[in-house]
Each structure stands twice: as structure tokens, then as C-alpha cells.
Curated annotation (Swiss-Prot):
Record gene name: rplC
Function: One of the primary rRNA binding proteins, it binds directly near the 3'-end of the 23S rRNA, where it nucleates assembly of the 50S subunit.
Entry keyword annotation includes rRNA-binding: yes
Gene3D superfamilies (UniProt xref): 3.30.160.810, Translation factors
Name of protein: Large ribosomal subunit protein uL3
Example GO BP: translation
Length: 208
């Protein structure tokens, strides 16, 4: 398994040799620095900690800077990847070329926030009739029973804040890799807004 930290640029479309159009999401992968390594003897599992993004010196506190090794500048985003198959060392810089041998990716990001929404938009409720004397249009309806149990159970679908959740889309095929621009194009949509931080890893279900 290999992983990288990237930034969502946006969506576009590309054409193959047959002239068929394919919608793709462009993800920019800047230099990923190996911040740290974890081994089985000390931590109980093996993992690689990657970081990317520059930080202003005025924004760096001493406790935050203390977790980085010497000659490694503090980075804005860090992520731990377990089961990393590449042999890397602390301070090594990774780029989009590590994905050249990968065919499918799992992409994880924070979805767009929609704010406070009702049950029709949030959960897909059909709602009531629009006419013929109906007084029930977009309401949630009943949320439970009567005297027994006399309460509403947990996890009942109700209005509330929608979005801004961690979402993982699996098995996105890599359509194109541009080493010069440092971008990877994956088939389909990726969660999050443009310029959002996304985490790429080898598709777990494709490795089996």
C-alpha cells in the first residue's frame, strides 16, 4: 500500500483514443515529506507519517515544531499511512511518481457542509402531497411510539446539520498522471470543495 496527501483542483473531462469522454477529478500532489516512521517493536504496528504544506514561522508553536526531526521544516498537514510498502526514510520527499504502478485509489476527504437541513434533503424522505388539502408537505412525521416506550429512540432520522463529514470513495481508477504538473486524474467525483485536502491510498479492496 502507498499513500499521498493531495489537494483537489476541480473536475474536467478527457478523451481516450476512441474519442470517448471520461469525467475526471484533478488532484494536485505537492511534495510529501516523510515526517516520521513507526515500527512494530515500539508502537505495535508499522506506519509512515507524511506531511505537506508550508507554514509561516509566526504560526509555529514550540510544541508543534518539537515533533519534527532536525532539518525538516514543520508542515501544515500530516497523515499516518499504515502498511506502507515503499522503503522510505525520514526526510525523503515523495511525489506523484509513486502512483505510477497503482491502478485504483481510495480517496478520503471532508465533504461539503450543507448547514441545517430538513429530512427531505438530508435523508431523502418523500414528504407529503402538495395539494388536495394536504397539511403535510416536508415534515418529518412520527418519530416513535406512544406511551410505551414514551420516548424517541436513538439514531432516528431527523433534521440537523448535513455534510462536513469524512467520506471515502473507493476504487477510483487512475486515468492519467502528469509528473510535470504534479497532478493525478481519477475517474469520477471526489468529496470536498475545490482546494480541499484529500488523502490518497491504494484501493484496499483491489489488493485482495
Amino acid at each position: 500500500m502507498v499513500g499521498l496527501i493531495g489537494q483537489k483542483v476541480g473536475m474536467t473531462q478527457i478523451f481516450d483514443a476512441r474519442g470517448c469522454v471520461t469525467p475526471v477529478t484533478v488532484i494536485r500532489v505537492e511534495h510529501n515529506v516523510v515526517v516520521g516512521l513507526k515500527d512494530v517493536e515500539r508502537f505495535g504496528y508499522s506506519a509512515v507519517i507524511l506531511g505537506t504544506g508550508c507554514m509561516k514561522k509566526s504560526r509555529i508553536s514550540k510544541p508543534y515544531a518539537g515533533q519534527f526531526a532536525e532539518r525538516i521544516p514543520p508542515v501544515r498537514v500530516m497523515r499516518e499511512f499504515r502498511g506502507f510498502t515503499l522503503d522510505v526514510s525520514v526526510g525523503q520527499v515523495l511525489d506523484v511518481r509513486v502512483l505510477e504502478s497503482v491502478r485504483y485509489l481510495d480517496v478520503c476527504a471532508l465533504s461539503k457542509g450543507k448547514g441545517f437541513q430538513g429530512v427531505v434533503k438530508r435523508w431523502g424522505f418523500s414528504g407529503g402531497r402538495s395539494s388536495h388539502g394536504s397539511k403535510f408537505h416536508r415534515e418529518a412525521g412520527s418519530t416513535g411510539q406512544c406511551t410505551s416506550p414514551g420516548r424517541t429512540f436513538k439514531n432516528v432520522k431527523m433534521p440537523g446539520r448535513m455534510g462536513a463529514e469524512r467520506v471515502t470513495v473507493q476504487n477510483l481508477r487512475i486515468e492519467r498522471i502528469d509528473v510535470g504538473l504534479g497532478v493525478v486524474m481519477v475517474r469520477g467525483a471526489v468529496p470536498g470543495r475545490n482546494k480541499a485536502t484529500v488523502f490518497l491510498r491504494t484501493a484496499v479492496k483491489r489488493e485482495r
